[in-house]
């Protein structure tokens, strides 16, 4: 525990030192406190940043990179290996995890390298526009995935029958391909522009950063603000529809009036509702109000609650993304609009900090899934123990299934023997001919509700 506390304290000191060095605030009282923290016991300084020396405290960011890569690999494994996560929404989340993992593999290390060399690009110059293009590609892919998830869930809840005709694994892959195609279309012009004119991707001929005001404005709106607006609107519409469906159920509406509910639970509830409606009433004196309540499908409310829980998890993901990336894009727009009226050095330093806050968002999503979803949490725990075997199937029990070889008479009153291979012959009534019934074995799970739960969103 002492070692852990020391490590955390050392990491915080490293990060504070990086911010102090980045913003050059050594004169302020806060910086004085930090300076004392960085002083060693013998009066020497723990970290110094003279000209030409790398910013070694920035290496603490390696922890963020490792967490980003490892967490998103766990998400990809969970969606690939857990059958309960095989639905359209989780396919989108797996594709989002791929984009976030590539941020940790290809974008964040080079950004860390730039920090170590005081934002002087140390690699071949032709790699600068390629790196910027990858940064824009994966950032755009993240917001586009969240926008597509929001749209897909709203359509599924608002028009379930129409959505079911186009909801399959192949269709989900096609939608994901469209998301990536849009992201590639936004990022491809950057290397073309940068290779033709290096001034578009270099500031002061040393710092690798996108330096085309027109592209910054257009790209920010196309890749962030427009998808963000669509995402927020559709998310609140989804919450509105779910609340309306809940109120309809609480007021006693039948399932015929709930045609807008999600198809995930529409299939499993309609059959049950029909059986209850056609079944004879054992108590003729039962009040109509009570009969109407029994007619209501029992699983519908639970399914709506599951949809609400899934929407809450996605809402947290949306909110985290909004909080993490809005400062960068707003500052990016302001730096272009205000031009020389703004303090450009301050803007550059703010952008350098805000872009890393956005990068951290790529590593937070797996934590959100772990905290709010039992399936992801159980899967992550298994994989961290190097247990990659699928879960065992639930135990089964045998129940008799009646297969009629001949039917006659209006009503059937057949007593089924427990033994499986017996032939049971009973008469429907005294005036009707005999009816031969055959009893067969049928295996079902002990808990049939598991079959229903697999059709419900597992986000």
From Swiss-Prot:
Detected in brain cortex, hypothalamus, brainstem and arcuate nucleus. Detected in the paraventricular nucleus of the hypothalamus. PROSITE patterns: G_PROTEIN_RECEP_F1_1, G_PROTEIN_RECEP_F1_2. GO terms for molecular function: 1-(4-iodo-2,5-dimethoxyphenyl)propan-2-amine binding; G protein-coupled serotonin receptor activity; Gq/11-coupled serotonin receptor activity; identical protein binding; serotonin binding; serotonin receptor activity. A motif (PDZ-binding) lies at residues 457-459. A motif (NPxxY motif) lies at residues 365-369. Residues 82-87, 153-168, 238-312, 372-459 are cytoplasmic. One of its GO terms (cellular component) is plasma membrane. One of its GO terms (biological process) is regulation of appetite. Disulfide bonds join 128-208, 338-342. Residues 33-56, 113-129, 191-214, 338-348 are extracellular. It is a multi-pass membrane protein. A motif (DRY motif) lies at residues 152-154. The keyword Cytoplasm does not apply. Glycans are attached at residues 204-205. Residues 288-298 have a biased composition (Basic residues). Residues 1-32 form the signal peptide. Ergotamine binds at residues 140, 210. Interacts with MPDZ. Interacts with ARRB2. Interacts with MPP3; this interaction stabilizes the receptor at the plasma membrane and prevents the desensitization of the HTR2C receptor-mediated calcium response. G-protein coupled receptor for 5-hydroxytryptamine (serotonin). Also functions as a receptor for various drugs and psychoactive substances, including ergot alkaloid derivatives, 1-2,5,-dimethoxy-4-iodophenyl-2-aminopropane (DOI) and lysergic acid diethylamide (LSD). Ligand binding causes a conformation change that triggers signaling via guanine nucleotide-binding proteins (G proteins) and modulates the activity of downstream effectors. The PDZ domain-binding motif is involved in the interaction with MPDZ. Belongs to the G-protein coupled receptor 1 family. This is 5-hydroxytryptamine receptor 2C. It comes from Mus musculus (Mouse). The gene is Htr2c.
């Amino acid at each position: 525990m002492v070692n852990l506390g020391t490590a955390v304290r050392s990491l915080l000191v490293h990060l504070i030192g990086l911010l102090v060095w980045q913003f050059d605030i050594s004169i302020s009282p806060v910086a004085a406190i930090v300076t004392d923290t960085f002083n060693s016991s013998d009066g020497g300084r723990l970290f110094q940043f003279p000209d030409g020396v790398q910013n070694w405290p920035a290496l603490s960011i390696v922890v963020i990179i490792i967490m980003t890569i490892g967490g998103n690999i766990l998400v990809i494994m969970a969606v690939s290996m857990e059958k309960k996560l095989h639905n359209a929404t989780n396919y989108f989340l797996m594709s989002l995890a791929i984009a976030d993992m590539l941020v940790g593999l290809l974008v964040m290390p080079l950004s860390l390298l730039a920090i170590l060399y005081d934002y002087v690009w140390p690699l071949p110059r032709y790699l600068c526009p390629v790196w910027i293009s990858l940064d824009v590609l994966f950032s755009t892919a993240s917001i586009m995935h969240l926008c597509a998830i929001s749209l897909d869930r709203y359509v599924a809840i608002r028009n379930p029958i129409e959505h079911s005709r186009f909801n399959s694994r192949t269709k989900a892959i096609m939608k994901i391909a469209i998301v990536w195609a849009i992201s590639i279309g936004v990022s491809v012009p950057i290397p073309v522009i940068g290779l033709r004119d290096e001034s578009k991707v270099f500031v002061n001929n040393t710092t690798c950063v996108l330096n085309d005001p027109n592209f910054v404005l257009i790209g920010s709106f196309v890749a962030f603000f427009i998808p963000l607006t669509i995402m927020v609107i559709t998310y609140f519409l989804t919450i509105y529809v779910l609340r309306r469906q809940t109120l309809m159920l609480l007021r006693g509406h039948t399932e015929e009036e709930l045609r807008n509910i999600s198809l995930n639970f529409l299939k499993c509830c309609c059959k049950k509702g029909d059986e209850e409606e056609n079944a004879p009433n054992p108590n003729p004196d039962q009040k109509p109000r009570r009969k109407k309540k029994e007619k209501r499908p029992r699983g519908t409310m639970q399914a709506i609650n599951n949809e609400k829980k899934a929407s809450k998890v996605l809402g947290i993901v949306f909110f985290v993304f909004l909080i993490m990336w809005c400062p960068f894009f707003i500052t990016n727009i302001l730096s272009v609009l205000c031009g020389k009226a703004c303090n450009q050095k301050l803007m550059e330093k703010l952008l350098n900090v805000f872009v890393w806050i956005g990068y951290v968002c790529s590593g937070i999503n797996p934590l959100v899934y772990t905290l709010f979803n039992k399936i992801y949490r159980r899967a992550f725990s298994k994989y961290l123990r190097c247990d990659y075997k699928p879960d065992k199937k639930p135990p089964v029990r045998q129940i008799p299934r009646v297969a009629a070889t001949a039917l006659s008479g209006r009503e059937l009153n057949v007593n089924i023997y427990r033994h499986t291979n017996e032939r049971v012959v009973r008469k429907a009534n005294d005036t009707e001919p005999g009816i031969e019934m055959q009893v067969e074995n049928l295996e079902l799970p002990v808990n049939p509700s598991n079959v229903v739960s697999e059709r419900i969103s597992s986000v």
